[in-house]
């Protein structure tokens, strides 16, 4: 029998949850990609860079059951959905953190989309928030941020559309091995197709999300 074993860093669902602290020692950085994931700036600052790229081809037959505006060229379009996102993360003494993520989305081959505001956003600051670690397991997050809880039935990043959905607000977070609490108040961002033209919506979203992980010994 032949056996193969590989090791890789776990990739989180959301980019700001990625943890590359295991690369803090320079001797563990063997490739250029690892070198940009944890860079020391003196003894107190660390920063990292990253990104993601998605190209998605879609083809439809009788889009929206054929109920499309009269000026549409066809109700059976095809389109190429393009998305690139870059992010930078800076931390200070594991106490403060600044996270920024830029978004570029575009639609090709289809001049008549039904949801253009979700298909194209040429350049935007998708996320820009500041974290402050408080006493105990508490953390305060302020700024433009993504929300995704549980199975994402109620609040999600909306991964299906080409442009993901951020919020602008404040979140007080508590994290322990078995309990997670998010207390939040925010405004959804209204995405526009141009360059740096997204605005805060007048709608608001506030609430408390709690998740408990029971002990394995109970089962």
Regions found by a protein language model. Give the residues of each.
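Surface-exposed loop and membrane-interface regions of Gram-negative outer-membrane beta-barrel proteins
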Residues: 61-82, 92-136, 152-157
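Residues that define the transmembrane beta-barrel architecture of outer-membrane proteins
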Residues: 45, 76-82, 121-126, 164-168, ...
């Amino acid at each position: 029998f032949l056996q193969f074993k590989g090791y890789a860093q776990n990739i989180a669902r959301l980019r700001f949850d990625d943890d590359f602290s295991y690369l803090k020692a320079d001797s563990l950085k063997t490739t250029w990609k690892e070198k940009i994931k944890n860079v020391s700036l003196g003894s107190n600052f660390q920063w990292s860079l990253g990104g993601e790229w998605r190209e998605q081809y879609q083809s439809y037959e009788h889009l929206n059951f054929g109920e499309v505006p009269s000026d549409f060229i066809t109700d059976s379009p095809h389109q190429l959905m393009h998305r690139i996102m870059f992010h930078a993360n800076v931390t200070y003494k594991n106490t403060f953190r600044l996270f920024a993520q830029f978004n570029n989305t575009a639609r090709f081959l289809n001049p008549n989309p039904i949801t253009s505001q979700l298909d194209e956003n040429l350049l935007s600051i998708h996320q820009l928030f500041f974290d402050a670690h408080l006493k105990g397991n508490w953390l305060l997050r302020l700024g433009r941020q993504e929300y995704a809880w549980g199975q994402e039935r109620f609040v999600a990043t909306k991964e299906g559309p080409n442009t993901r959905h951020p919020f602008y607000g404040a979140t007080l977070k508590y994290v322990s091995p078995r309990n997670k609490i998010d207390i939040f108040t925010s405004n959804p961002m209204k995405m526009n197709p141009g360059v740096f033209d997204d605005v805060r919506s007048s709608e608001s979203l506030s609430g408390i999300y709690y998740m408990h992980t029971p002990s394995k010994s109970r089962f």
